Regions:
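Phenylalanine-focused residue identity feature
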Residues: 7, 25, 34, 106-108, ...
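His/Glu-rich zincin catalytic helix
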Residues: 1-63
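Acidic-enriched, low-complexity/disordered segments with a strong bias for Aspartate over Glutamate
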Residues: 2, 10-12, 24, 35, ...
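Histidine-acidic residue clusters that define the catalytic metal-binding segment
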Residues: 144-162
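Active-site-adjacent, His/Asp/Glu-enriched structural segments that form or flank metal-binding
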Residues: 76-149
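M16/MPP (pitrilysin/insulinase) zinc-metallopeptidase core fold and M16-derived inactive scaffolds
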Residues: 41-97
Length: 162
């Protein structure tokens, strides 16, 4: 079988950042899938699943309520490898265009207090699997160390040279 494009990224060189994972057409509209990479793959511990689940709930809630972007949000969800999240937006977009949106999103998570939206049995399939303190800590770290200091290396995928 052919190797899928996401397996052609050089994960040995991949940094934390915001990357265009793919762009697809749905009808006449382009949708852009972003890799929101919070951890360096295989070089630092993955995100704790409870923290990642909480980030999912809070980020999805924030994004779907953001006055500028809410109509373009298709999906926000965690990566199976636990090193980040995927964001799918309507439009032909690049990574630099959403840095401010991601900064606002992760600032929201980093400063969130109170009940986690959707963390109730009737709303969530695993409502007990949350860790707000770690979600806040990971989000603050991502803002301070990546989003406030990003360069091209944090915005453009390193592809493997085969």
């Amino acid at each position: 079988m052919d190797k899928i494009p996401s397996f052609t990224i050089d994960h040995d060189r991949l940094l934390r950042g915001i990357y265009v994972s793919r762009q697809d057409f749905i009808g006449n509209e382009v949708v852009t899938t972003f890799d929101i990479r919070m951890k360096e793959p295989n070089r630092e511990p993955a995100l704790h699943i409870g923290a990642l689940h909480t980030i999912e709930h809070l980020a999805a809630t924030y994004l779907r309520n953001d006055s500028e972007w809410k109509e373009r949000v298709v999906y926000w969800g965690p990566m199976g490898c636990l090193t980040g999240n995927y964001l799918i937006l309507k439009g032909n977009l690049n990574s630099a265009e959403i840095v401010d949106l991601m900064r606002r999103t992760f600032e929201f998570v980093a400063s969130f207090e109170g009940e986690i939206p959707g963390a109730a049995p009737k709303d969530c399939g695993n409502y007990l699997l949350h860790d707000l303190p770690m979600a806040r800590w990971e989000s603050r770290k991502f803002v301070d160390e990546v989003l406030n200091k990003n360069t091209e290396d944090n915005l453009i995928y390193p592809f493997r040279e085969e």
